[in-house]
Amino acid sequence: MAAVMSVNESTFDAEILKADRPVLVDFWAPWCGPCRLVSPVIESVGEKHGGRITVAKVNTDENQALAMRYSIFSIPTLIVFEHGREAARLVGYMPQEAMEERLAPFLA
């Protein structure tokens, strides 16, 4: 399985909300500079912690209904879903160490 999966409006509920472990979802867009900066960090988290957390990406340009559903007003926005509910929200770029620190409760 890839370190990071892409989801869309038709696969989101099954892949994210019904997942049996925490899921980190990166809401991004191709034109977004900070999104491009955080992308390698997201990939690394997926590779390093893939056994404990699922990592997914949602292109907000292609999935505007999902962006509206989760009130995504700026990108990148990262949401951790646990048991089908939003458990944490991170907005903007952050280095890997800071991201892993914020995700620590979900990686145990």
What are these regions (language model features)?
Residues 3, 8, 28, 54-56:
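Conserved Rossmann-like nucleotide-binding pocket used by diverse enzymes
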Residues 58-67:
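Structural microenvironment flanking redox-active thiols in thiol-disulfide oxidoreductases
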Residues 5-23, 64:
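A short beta-strand-turn-helix
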